[in-house]
C-alpha cells in the first residue's frame, strides 16, 4: 500500500479539492478521501465543495483498539467535532458551510 507521505510532490487531497470541484462543475458529486482525521477536516472539505469526506483511518484505528465500541466512539467524536466546527462558523447544518467559511492557507 502506498501512502501520500511516500509520494514527493503529490498535492494533498484537500489542496486539490477546489480544482476538482471546479472541473466537475456540478455535473457530479465530489467525494474526497485522504488525510481526513478530524471533524474540522471534514467541515473544511464540505466548505470547499465535497459532498462528503471519507474518514477510514480513524475508523480503522477505532476498530483495532476497541472493536465495534471503538468504531462507535470514533464516529461519535467525529460527529461532535463536526457539530462544534459548524457552530463555530455559524452553521447549523453541513449543507450550510461554504468556501466563505474557509480561511485561505498562509503563504
Residue ranges and their predicted role:
Residues 6-9, 34-35:
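Glycine- and other small-residue-rich loops at beta-strand/loop junctions that grip anionic moieties
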Residues 5-7, 61-62:
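Short secondary-structure capping/turn micro-motifs that flank functional sites
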Amino acid at each position: 500500500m502506498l501512502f501520500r507521505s511516500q509520494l514527493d510532490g503529490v498535492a494533498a487531497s484537500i489542496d486539490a479539492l477546489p480544482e476538482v470541484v471546479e472541473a466537475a462543475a456540478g455535473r457530479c458529486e465530489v467525494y474526497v478521501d485522504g488525510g481526513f482525521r478530524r471533524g474540522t477536516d471534514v467541515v473544511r472539505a464540505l466548505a470547499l465543495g465535497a459532498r462528503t469526506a471519507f474518514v477510514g483511518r480513524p475508523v480503522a484505528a477505532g476498530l483495532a483498539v476497541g472493536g465495534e465500541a471503538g468504531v462507535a466512539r470514533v464516529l461519535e467524536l467525529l460527529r461532535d467535532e463536526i457539530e462544534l466546527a459548524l457552530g463555530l462558523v455559524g452553521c447549523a447544518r453541513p449543507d450550510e458551510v461554504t468556501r466563505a467559511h474557509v480561511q485561505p492557507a498562509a503563504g
